[in-house]
């Protein structure tokens, strides 16, 4: 029988259990995938810990790649054996087999490996909408990227550089500085060592940045606001240090008539057409060499506990893949 990682109670990484799992036959409009690579993301930690509420038991994981092994009634345009990938709002990717709505599957083109796709569907599509839709980065823009050596951060910095932006990256440790520089950062700051707002003001000649991409949350929120230029945009899209603290709307005016948004990938790929258009642009950027996918760690799916512990301790670099 196939196996999966289960969460039967919310808590630390120790609650993850490797157990038998039978998804059954695919239903109408579904395809059954045999996973070949699964992406690890901080949202999986939020699901496991209970920050994001789901009914238990829960199989974590939002993105994966694999091959189709069965098709449900009414599915058109897909075939048995085809390589596909997905990102879903519903967890369930930490499994060897999974039934997935066929309309949410993206066929993989030549030149995109299963591991690349598993590292790209959530993180890469996140980078795509942040840079191309939430704020359309232009040549000459100063931008600030937190967690610049992480999976999303490395993609954001590379892509922004190809768009002509001047990228300031923030990393958690000294040993990640050179990696961030190689992936598009003009300047790299180290959290806890460099005074963030003071450093950004100095680098931008006191102008501030047009946009901050902040996936850290609680620990960086207010200082990120202080890095923005007048009418700048704060994009808060993650909670790796915990949710951002409460803030009165008047704070935005006091700091320069700032804009604040809290976007979600799934609102940018609501339709199949939006999903496939975003994936086409993303895959084209990878195949052209504009984006390099760094898979820094690979773990057997059965070792998901260790993978979660390393992610939470910030011992990972780039993307992390779980192998079923």
Residue ranges of predicted features:
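Glycine-rich phosphate-binding loop and adjacent beta-alpha segment
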Residues: 171, 219-290, 324
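Short glycine-centered segments of the SAM/dcSAM-binding site in methyltransferase folds
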Residues: 83, 142, 166, 232-233, ...
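Hydrophobic/small residue at the entry helix of a nucleotide-binding pocket
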Residues: 152
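Glycine-rich beta-strand-centered segment in the early N-terminal region that forms part
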Residues: 22-39, 49-91
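C-terminal hydrophobic helical "lid"/dimerization subdomain
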Residues: 272-324
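Adenosine-nucleotide cofactor-binding segment
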Residues: 161-220, 271
